[in-house]
Amino acid sequence: MHIKADEISTIIKEQIQNYSQRIETTEVGTVLSVGDGIARVYGVQDVMSMELLEFPGNLLGMVLNLEQDNVGVALLGDDTGVEEGSTVKRTGRIFSVPVGDAVTGRVLNPLGQPLDGLGPLNATEKKPVEVKAPSIIDRKSIYEPLVTGIKAIDAMTPIGRGQRELIIGDRQTGKTSICIDAILAQKESGVHCFYVAIGQKASTVALVADTLRKHGAMEYTTIIAATASDPAPLQYISPYSGCTMAEYYRDHGQHALIVYDDLSKQAVAYRQMSLLLRRPPGREAFPGDVFYLHSRLLERAAKLSDELGGGSLTALPIIETQAGDVSAYIPTNVISITDGQVYLEPNLFNAGVRPAINVGLSVSRVGGAAQTKAMKQVSGTMRLDLAQYRELAAFAQFSSDLDKETQTKLERGARLVELLKQPQYQPMQLPEQVIVMFAATKGFMDDIPIDHIQNFSKTLIEYIQTMNPKILENISTQQALNEELDQQLTTAITECKKTFLPMNKR
C-alpha cells in the first residue's frame, strides 16, 4: 500500500484551517427537593419568572417563585423521573403556545401538544401565555350581538362581542350545556370558538368533543384540555394557553369566543400550588393574589378599536357554586370582574325549566347595546312580565279569587316560562327567536294551552318558512320591525293559529 505524504499533509492543513472552536454554555442547576408537582432548584442564578426549565426526561417546569437562594418550579408533567440532585437546564424561553389556524379543530393540552391522535400540529407561530390586556385606548364599546341561540339569554341577558358573561350555578344545572349551545350557534357567524376544560373528567371532555363533532362545530372550534388527572400546574395554566390561542384571532381583526369550564377548579389548582410553594394563605386558604389570577385572564377579553382591526374576544367563564352560595370568595371575585352573569338554579332545573336560568338574578351589564333592534322591540317588557308573574304566582298561592287582570298576567307568565324552555343542543336563529317572542308578548299565545306552547312555536316557524319566508329574510336584513313587518307577522300568526287550534282540540 502506497501512502502519499503530500496528500495527507494537504488534508491535515485543510482541517486545521477549517477548525472552529465552538463553546456552548448552559446555565444549570440542581434539584434540592421535589414532590406534588413542585421542585426547588438551586443554582440557576439569572432565571426569569415564567421561564421554562428542562428537567431529566424532557420534562418542562415553569419558574414561579424567585427566592434568595433557590427557585420554586411548577412541573408541567409527571415528576416520577425527577429526584434530589437531578440536573436542571435553563431554556431561556418564556412559556409559549402555538397559535394560528393550525390549532382549529384540534384537541390540545395546555402546552399545545395534540391529544386527539390526528398527527402533529403544523403551527408556524408561538405566543407567550402571559400577555398584557388591551389598554382603555385600544378598546371600543361593545355594540355587536353574539347570538347564543338560547331564547332566555338573547332576549333578557344579551351577550355582545367582547363581553365577559359569567355562567354561575351549582353542579349539574346545565352550565356546560349553555356554553356548548353558544358554540353551536356560531356555525354561520364566522366566530372562532375555544373550549378550555379545567380539571374535568377525561370522559366528559371526550363527550364534549364528540358532541361538537356530531354537530359539525369542530370545524371552527379548538379544545384545550387539562383533565382531573393532570398535575395542578397544567390546570392552572390552561386558561391562559387557551386565551393566547383565541387572542390571535382578536388581534387579526376577527372574532373569537372562549369558554373556561370552570374557573373554580383553576382557583383550587392555584391554591394547591401556592401552598406547596409556601406562599402565605388568605381567605379560604387561597393566596392573596387569587383575584389577580382571574382579573388578568378575563381582562384579555375585549372589543378592539377600529385602528387595531376591530376584532373581539368574548369570554364565558363558568363558576360552580356550593349549595347556591354566590357570596363565597371565588364567585364574588368573578362576579365583580365580569360584565354580568347568567345564574342557574337547581330548583328550576329539577322542575323541568331548562335552561334553568333565574331571570331575576341574571343580568347583562352591556344590555341593550348588544341586542338587535328587532329583539329589543319584542322582548322589552319580557323581564318585567316574568318578574310580575313570579310575584303574583307566590301571592296567588294564598288567594283563590283573583281579578281578571291578575289572572291574565298569571296565564301569560306561565306561557312565557314555557316558551323559554329549550331542548339541549338546539340553538335558535335570531329571526326565529324574534317571531316566537313577538307571538308571546303580543298576546297571540294567550289562548293556546300551556302544554302546546312548544309545539305551536315549532309549527309557527315551519309555517312562516313555508308560506312566507320573506319575513325571516326581512328580519335578518333589516334587524328591526316596522309597521309592514308587524302586519305581516300578525297575519301569519293568525293564519297559523287557525290551522293549529282545531288540530289540537281533537
UniProtKB/Swiss-Prot annotation:
Family annotation (Gene3D superfamilies): 2.40.30.20, ATP synthase alpha/beta chain, C-terminal domain, P-loop containing nucleotide triphosphate hydrolases
Give the chief site where it resides: membrane
Keywords of this entry:
ATP synthesis, ATP-binding, Cell membrane, CF(1), Hydrogen ion transport, Ion transport, Membrane, Nucleotide-binding, Translocase, Transport
Q: Known EC number(s)?
A: 7.1.2.2
Q: Which domain of life is it from?
A: Bacteria
What this protein catalyses is: ATP + H2O + 4 H(+)(in) = ADP + phosphate + 5 H(+)(out)
Compartments, as annotated in UniProt? Cell membrane
- What does the record say about its membrane topology? Peripheral membrane protein
| Record keyword Repeat present | no
Q: Which GO terms describe its cellular component?
A: plasma membrane; proton-transporting ATP synthase complex
- List the Pfam families hit by this protein, alphabetically: ATP-synt_ab, ATP-synt_ab_C, ATP-synt_ab_N
- Residues reported to bind ATP: G169, D170, R171, Q172, T173, G174, K175, T176
Q: What are the GO MF terms of this UniProt record?
A: ADP binding; ATP binding; proton-transporting ATP synthase activity, rotational mechanism
Q: Where is this site: Required for activity?
A: S362
Question: Subunit structure, per the record?
Answer: F-type ATPases have 2 components, CF(1) - the catalytic core - and CF(0) - the membrane proton channel. CF(1) has five subunits: alpha(3), beta(3), gamma(1), delta(1), epsilon(1). CF(0) has three main subunits: a(1), b(2) and c(9-12). The alpha and beta chains form an alternating ring which encloses part of the gamma chain. CF(1) is attached to CF(0) by a central stalk formed by the gamma and epsilon chains, while a peripheral stalk is formed by the delta and b chains.
Record family assignment: Belongs to the ATPase alpha/beta chains family.
* Biological role: Produces ATP from ADP in the presence of a proton gradient across the membrane. The alpha chain is a regulatory subunit.
Quote the protein name from its UniProt record. Answer: ATP synthase subunit alpha
What organism does this protein naturally occur in? Lawsonia intracellularis (strain PHE/MN1-00)
